[in-house]
């Protein structure tokens, strides 16, 4: 039976530096996210939102505390086990888009579906449809270096969508995009949630996007507070 709680966090702390130079970023985060929820993480720039998102996705570690992802405690896992867990269950879009530089846009987007076991034709058709939806139908054969920053962002989002993950972590998914494109991205995010039950956890400064989520959590002084 799939875990009811996609993410579970207790007493999470994160500090950098040592001694008098030590800086506390997270000071005791508590969080439970149920399967299928949509969560917005908001807060001032530099408050630690991106750091928290990376820890939740198993890409970074806290200094202390417990984090579980799809029912699996991350502190018990080595990086190989975490990578397998992410490949099976997790999609993510961070501000560094992590596109494979030697693959073109279409190949980058179809990769998650191939890893999931879809046929080459299925994965390619799905990837092409997503890229066309995002206005990149004429950029299918372009390498990441040949795309603008906004275009790379859309490719990264399409790749995450094409994996149909159990949970999608997104850092400013509509940042640096015009309102029309941002609204299209938001609609795709919530269709992924609605049609596939994907849990969404996103850092955003976009108040319209945050308002569409089930819960909006503000990171203040290293701890989460629920917004009204």
Swiss-Prot record:
Gene3D superfamilies (UniProt xref): P-loop containing nucleotide triphosphate hydrolases
The organism's place on the tree of life at top rank: Bacteria
A GO molecular-function descriptor: ATP hydrolysis activity
Keywords: ATP-binding, Nucleotide-binding, Transport
UniProt cross-references to InterPro entries, sorted A to Z: AAA+_ATPase, ABC_transporter-like_ATP-bd, ABC_transporter-like_CS, MacB-like_ATP-bd, P-loop_NTPase
Domain ABC transporter: 7-228
List of residues binding ATP: 43-50
NCBIfam families xref list: PRK10584.1 (NF007879)
UniProt similarity note: Belongs to the ABC transporter superfamily.
Record protein name field: Uncharacterized ABC transporter ATP-binding protein YbbA
